[in-house]
Each structure stands twice: as structure tokens, then as C-alpha cells.
């Protein structure tokens, strides 16, 4: 299905670099991106207009999620090194599915913060774990094109989801927003099914002989990376 769609768009030269496992991962990611597109742009509207929280609190929740995900990111890296990207990705997708589903029922600030924490954990796990899996499944010289293709599929999915959400949601009607979050949570489960179907080696942990020395001190010394992070 994915191959036919992109070949019709003249993008078959990207597909030449993808084996069946990588295509499966990217297709699962695109389905999940459709779910994200359903809810991504409506998060503040949902909390503020539908649930009645102030705009300041709603914005603070978004900032909290970003900061919390950044803080636990080193821990996610350790887990990926220890257990492999595939396992962490599956875990993150199930966590995110629970968080998104729960968001449809929040009624108090503590509930919002609790759900936001779950969502942040899922976000922190999913992207780096997916990146590791994709890296292991394609040849080094093809990675730039493969990652570009993955981003393109991601953006396409988000765009489709945004269009669908505009057709589904009704202003001021709680049930239509809840429906969007339920649909979004299902796409995470679908993506998790794709991830489970991947071979174990797709995100295998590093062997002791492959493990290289290094620390975050070396990362912080990379001036180009720090400039990019500040930007």
C-alpha cells in the first residue's frame, strides 16, 4: 500500500533504499502521524475551551511536557542501549496510547498534569527509539534519504490528520473532541503492532564489543550541536 502510493507520486527512488522492515516501520509511523494530526493543533483549544482551564495553565502544561521529556531523555538513551530500540519503542507507544486515551477524560488540574507526564514519557521514548530502529535497518549510505523519506511520511500523515479533524470536530461539543483522542490512541496501538512485528535485531542493544566509550561531556563540548540546540 505504501509502496504503491509513493510510486504513484514518483518517489520510488526513496523506496529502493528501504527493505520490508523499514517500510513497515515508516508506514506505521505515518498511520500514527494521522492520529497526531487529529489532535495536535487542538490541544490548547481542548483544555481551554472544552475543559475550561485557563489559557495560562494550558500553555504551562505544554511547556511542562517539553521540559519533562527533555529531562528524562538521557534515561531513555540508557534504556535503548540496554534493551534495544524496538523494546523501548513498543513501550513508549503503549504508554502514549494510554496517555492520549486518558486525555479525553481529564476534569481537574492534577489529572491534566498526570496525563501530561504520561504523554511526555511516551514522546521522550518514541522518537529516539524509532530512530535507532530505522538506523539499524538501512545501510549507512542510504540513511539520509531514508530519514528524509520518514519525515516526509510523518508530515503527510499529520496533514491528513489535520484535515480529518476539521471534518470531525464540532466547536464546543465535548464528545467530538473525545472521539479524536480515542482515534489518536488507536493509531498508537496500530504503530505498536507494526513495531512488535519487526525482527528483534531491528533495535538490538549494543554488544559489549561494540560499545564505545563516551559521555555527555563530549556532547556538550560539540559547539555545532550546542548552537543547533539553542536555535
For every predicted segment, state its role.
Residues 1-22, 200-231:
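Juxtamembrane intracellular "pre-TM" segments in multi-pass secondary transporters
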Residues 9-67, 226-231:
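Helix-loop boundary and gating motifs at the non-cytosolic
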Residues 49, 160-180:
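Transmembrane alpha-helix termini and helix-breaking/packing motifs in multi-pass membrane transporters
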Residues 66-74, 159:
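Residue-level signature of mid-helix packing/kink "hotspots" within the transmembrane helices
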Residues 104-116:
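Helix-loop junctions at membrane interfaces in 12-TM secondary transporters
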Residues 117-154:
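Cytoplasmic helix-loop-helix junction between adjacent transmembrane helices
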Residues 186-206:
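C-terminal membrane-cytosol helix-exit motif in multi-pass small-molecule transporters
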Amino acid at each position: 500500500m505504501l509502496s504503491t502510493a509513493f510510486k504513484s507520486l514518483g518517489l520510488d527512488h526513496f523506496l529502493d533504499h528501504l527493505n520490508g522492515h523499514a517500510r513497515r516501520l515508516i508506514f506505521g509511523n505515518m498511520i500514527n502521524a494521522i492520529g497526531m494530526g487529529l489532535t495536535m493543533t487542538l490541544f490548547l483549544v481542548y483544555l481551554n475551551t472544552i475543559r475550561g482551564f485557563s489559557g495560562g495553565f494550558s500553555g504551562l502544561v505544554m511547556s511542562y511536557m517539553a521540559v519533562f521529556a527533555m529531562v528524562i531523555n538521557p534515561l531513555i538513551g540508557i534504556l535503548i542501549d540496554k534493551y534495544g530500540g524496538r523494546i523501548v519503542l513498543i513501550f513508549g507507544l503503549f504508554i502514549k496510547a494510554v496517555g492520549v486515551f486518558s486525555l479525553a477524560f481529564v476534569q481537574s488540574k492534577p489529572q491534566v498534569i498526570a496525563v501530561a507526564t504520561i504523554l511526555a514519557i511516551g514522546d521522550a521514548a518514541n522518537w529516539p527509539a524509532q530512530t535507532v530502529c530505522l538506523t539499524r535497518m538501512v545501510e549507512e549510505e542510504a540513511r539520509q534519504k531514508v530519514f528524509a523519506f520518514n519525515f516526509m511520511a510523518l508530515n503527510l500523515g499529520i496533514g491528513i490528520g489535520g484535515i480529518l479533524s476539521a471534518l470531525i470536530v464540532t466547536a464546543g461539543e465535548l464528545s467530538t473532541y473525545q472521539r479524536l483522542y480515542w482515534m489518536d490512541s488507536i493509531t498508537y496501538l496500530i504503530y505498536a503492532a507494526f513495531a512488535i512485528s519487526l525482527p528483534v535485531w531491528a533495535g538490538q542493544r549494543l554488544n559489549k564489543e561494540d560499545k564505545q566509550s563516551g559521555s555527555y561531556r563530549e556532547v556538550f563540548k560539540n559547539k555545532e550541536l550546542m548552537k543547533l540546540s539553542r536555535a
